[in-house]
Structures are given as structure tokens and as C-alpha cells.
Amino acid sequence: IAGIPIDELQEIVFSQANSDEFLYNRIMTKYAPITPCHMIRLKQQVNDIGYHYSDRGGFVDYYHATDYTDALNTLLDENVPLLLEKNYRMEAFELVNCIFYEIGNRDIDDSDGGTSFVADNCYEYWQTILQECNDKEKENMFQWFQDHQENYVIDYLEDYISDFLLNEFHDEELLQKKLHMLDEKIVKFQKENYSGDSYSAYYGMVNNIITRICLMEELSYSKQEIKEYRQKYRNFSEI
């Protein structure tokens, strides 16, 4: 390769990129400014992966599942670090969310657990992005997670969103917002969902209360304040 004249090498790369959408996007992510148009192309690449590995009904069968999830992970690993390296943090976040939405809504034979593999990768990239964000970007991320807790992906993958929201934001202002959010959830459980005969509703209520207490401790509430809050829910043995 070192012996190829630079103009001929550029011509070869240009020809290959024109016939390979994935290669084109990778080159553009690494070397070109990131424009809204390029983000559209990256998100279209996510859609193309889903289309390529699924049947007419949108189902990814067992024999294509691994290739499908590998393709999504490769798209993450080839683009997100490059976007972050160039300080396009919100664009990286946008791409991760697009892939999480794809895996979270794709009908798939998940016998090998590939869905969780992709979702775990998304979670780790969310963590990396959050660590590099400024305060405004953290608020934007927080708002996104808050707005997408329900009906965004298949039910068990919603846990990734709620877990990230509750476990990964530690700025005082965002902790206060989480406290308020949990209060709203607890009130909602009390009014609509909680029933002593419902196992899932019962433990949903309990988990929210316990998480609320942990937040109070992180926010340095006094022992007396925490004790008084516990007393409000003393009918729950776990509290």
C-alpha cells in the first residue's frame, strides 16, 4: 500500500466508499465535520441493518440474530468513539439512542441473548458520554431518559432506561429532580397501581420508596428527616 501513488490510493478509496455505504459513513465520521445530514445517514444505516437481517414481517430469526446484533455493535464501536473524540457528544448520544430503539423494538429470536449484549453496549456508551458532558448536556440527557421511561422499547429493556436515570446522574440539581420524579411515581402507585394483592405493583412501590430514601441519604438529609419519611411507609416490611 505504501507504494501506491497517493492520487491512485484516493481514487481506490473513493470508488470503494461510493459502493459501500457503511465504509462511506465510517470515513465521513472520522474525517469530515458531523452535519445533520451525516447523522441522518448513520441512522439510516441502523434501519438498513434491521431490514437486511429480518424477513418480510420484520422478524430476525435464529440463524440471522447473531449477525444482526454483531452489526449493530460494530456500528456503535466504529462510530461512537470517533464522535466523542471530535467532541460531538450529543450526536453520539443520538446514535446510541437510535440503536437502542432498533434493538428494543425488533422482533427477534433472542435465544443467544444478543439483544442484551447490544443493550449493555448502549448502556456503557451512555455512561461514557455522560462522563464527558457539560452541565447543559447532562440536563438534556436527564430529560431524554425521563421522557422515555415508558412505551419506548419492549418492557424489559425499559429497565435499562430507568436504571440509568436513577443510578447515573449525581449532580445535586439532577438528584433533586430525581427525588421529585420518584415522589410523582409513588403518588401514582398509591392512586392507581398499588394493590396488596399485586406482587409487581407492591414491589414497584417498595423499590421506589427505597430508592427515594437512598437519594435522601446522597443529598445529606438528616437522620431525623429520613426517619420521618420511613415512618410514612411503615406498613411495608421492607422499609
What does each model-found stretch correspond to?
Residues 1-239:
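Eukaryote-biased, non-catalytic alpha-solenoid scaffold regions
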